[in-house]
């Protein structure tokens, strides 16, 4: 109410705890499909990502909502990527079912902020994922001689070995972009 920016790390858990997460997810789906439809229909090479909460991943109730919102827009399901953090995959069986239904409908699925959560590598290997998004904390360490910078080549190699698309988050410098490009990272996003 005071006009200040509030981080999703703060309001998403509040929305989940208060039972408002479904309404928030529905609002985001409506906004994305309405606001981006003309752009996505005009250029089929573009995509937009919708971040999902752990509750969304467990219930899967957002999929029919998304498909109703896409009906008649001309937007292809492959242009809507679905993302969840490692926390969203903690209930692996429910998440796996949701991911399989999303992928069978044509959506690409990404694990967001990879490396900052608690998932095991065996969980990562077992999930039907299309993309891995490297957290910005690793990207910002590129060229900084930080201990974190030694981790990023291993994340990239692992994602390539799993045949996942790779997205680097928080790319802000030419040096970071060049390093990531030369390492085979396909997509970058700024902060």
Role assignments for model-derived ranges:
Residues 1-2, 18-95, 170:
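Catalytic core of bacterial c-di-GMP phosphodiesterases, primarily the EAL and HD-GYP domains
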Residues 1-17, 35, 39, 43, ...:
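Regulatory and interdomain segments flanking nucleotide-handling catalytic cores
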Residues 1-13, 32, 67, 130-132, ...:
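A short, well-structured catalytic beta-strand-centered motif of the EAL phosphodiesterase domain
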Residues 7, 61-63, 94-95, 120, ...:
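Residues at alpha-helix caps and immediate loop-helix transition turns in enzyme cores, especially N-
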Residues 14-20, 137-143:
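A short, internal acetyl-CoA/4′-phosphopantetheine-binding micro-motif in the GNAT/acyltransferase core
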Residues 24-27, 148-154:
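Conserved acetyl-CoA-binding loop-helix of GNAT-fold acetyltransferases
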């Amino acid at each position: 109410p005071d006009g200040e920016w509030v981080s999703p790390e703060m309001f998403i858990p509040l929305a989940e705890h208060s039972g408002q997460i479904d309404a928030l997810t529905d609002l985001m789906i409506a906004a994305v499909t309405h606001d981006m439809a003309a752009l996505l229909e005009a250029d089929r090479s573009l995509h937009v990502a919708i971040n999902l909460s752990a509750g969304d991943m467990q219930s899967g109730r957002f999929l029919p909502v998304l498909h109703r919102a896409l009906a008649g827009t001309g937007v292809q399901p492959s242009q809507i990527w679905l993302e969840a953090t490692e926390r969203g995959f903690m209930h692996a069986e429910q998440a796996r079912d949701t991911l399989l239904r999303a992928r069978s409908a044509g959506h690409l699925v990404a694990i967001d902020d990879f490396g900052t959560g608690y998932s095991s590598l065996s969980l990562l290997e077992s999930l039907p994922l299309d993309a891995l998004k490297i957290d910005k904390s690793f990207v910002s360490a590129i060229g900084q001689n930080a201990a974190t910078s030694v981790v990023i080549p291993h994340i990239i190699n692992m994602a390539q070995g799993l045949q996942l698309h790779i997205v680097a988050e928080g790319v802000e410098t030419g040096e970071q972009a060049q390093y990531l490009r030369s390492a085979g990272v396909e997509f970058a996003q700024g902060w």
